[in-house]
């Protein structure tokens, strides 16, 4: 039986949410999202038994499907498992979400309308919402090309046609975490499609907790304070990405490598765990050059 054979019962809009040691806020995020989609698929990446059981109970109450991986398989694999389930159940549209993202009223309806509006004029691959930091209330700046389309797209809150995902393939499992969204964005752009923003659809999203600093009372800057593990995957995956997309998108990678060295300097100046983070940074570089991929830490 194909999806065409079950036209009358197929869920039109599916959402995939990846969880990892979810807190109480995640339950509210899922409750806000569930009424806005036909099918909600939650993929848990190795949370505690108690957390998984809580998700299971909530799934029974709200009517969503839980896929419990049992261990941390990485964000790419988790997204792929959720997307595959959506394809199996004949979804036409797929939303992807992080656990710390919360939809606003009418979010999915605005995104679907926005997608159709853009796609009527240009070949569209991914549509993202307007991201607002839930702590500060500030919008997240986006990087645009001269034609107004986006350079890359954040995965959380993004919308794709199921057919586009089927054509372009799964997220890159070998990246494990970090750069997963950049990689897929470049794959979309290389296919001749664009990335666009729907400004009317607002998604409250955690944009990190950068810490402000002042050097000599004059130079003001922010440090990212990423963990050693995050540092490792950032640098390793950046090299893998350059190997695959550097010639096609040289300006992006020039900026990314410059940012790496600036972040390393900030790390040495003001962050804690300097030695652990520095070791992770250079180990990531070394493993990237050796093409040692997958889960390594």
Label the predicted regions.
Residues 91-102:
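Short beta-strand-to-loop acidic/aromatic patch adjacent to the donor-nucleotide binding site
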Residues 143-160, 223-226:
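A recurrent flexible, glycine/aromatic-enriched loop bordering the glycosyltransferase active site
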Residues 164, 168-169, 174-207:
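A short, conserved alpha-helix in the catalytic core of glycosyltransferases
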Residues 105-139:
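Conserved donor NDP-sugar-binding/catalytic core segment of glycosyltransferases
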Residues 242-297:
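Non-catalytic, C-terminal membrane-associated alpha-helical segments of glycosyltransferases
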């Amino acid at each position: 039986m194909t999806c065409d054979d079950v036209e009358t019962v197929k869920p039109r809009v599916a959402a995939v949410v990846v969880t990892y040691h979810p807190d109480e806020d995640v339950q509210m995020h899922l409750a806000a999202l569930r009424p806005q989609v036909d099918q909600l698929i939650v993929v848990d990446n190795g949370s505690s038994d108690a957390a998984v059981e809580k998700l299971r109970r909530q799934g029974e109450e709200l009517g969503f499907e839980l896929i419990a991986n049992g261990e941390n398989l990485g964000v790419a694999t988790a997204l792929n498992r959720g997307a595959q389930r959506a394809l199996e159940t004949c979804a036409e549209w797929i939303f992807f979400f992080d656990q710390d993202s919360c939809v606003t009223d009418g979010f999915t309806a605005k995104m679907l309308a926005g997608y159709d509006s853009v796609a009527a004029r240009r070949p569209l691959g991914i549509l993202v919402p307007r991201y607002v930091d839930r702590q500060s209330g500030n919008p997240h700046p986006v990087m645009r090309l001269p034609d107004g389309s986006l350079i890359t797209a954040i995965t959380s809150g993004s919308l794709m046609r199921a057919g586009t995902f089927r054509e372009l393939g799964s997220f890159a499992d070998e990246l494990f975490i970090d750069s997963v969204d950049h990689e897929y964005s470049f794959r979309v752009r290389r296919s001749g499609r664009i990335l666009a923003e729907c400004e009317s659809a607002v998604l409250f999203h955690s944009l990190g907790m950068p810490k402000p600093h002042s050097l000599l009372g004059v130079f003001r800057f922010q440090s990212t304070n990423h963990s050693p593990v995050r540092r490792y995957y950032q640098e390793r995956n950046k090299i893998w990405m350059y190997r695959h997309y550097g010639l096609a998108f040289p300006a992006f990678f020039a900026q990314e490598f410059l940012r790496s060295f600036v972040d390393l300097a900030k790390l040495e100046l003001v962050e804690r765990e300097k030695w652990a983070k520095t070791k992770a940074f250079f180990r990531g570089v070394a493993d990237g050059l050796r093409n040692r991929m997958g889960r390594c830490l």
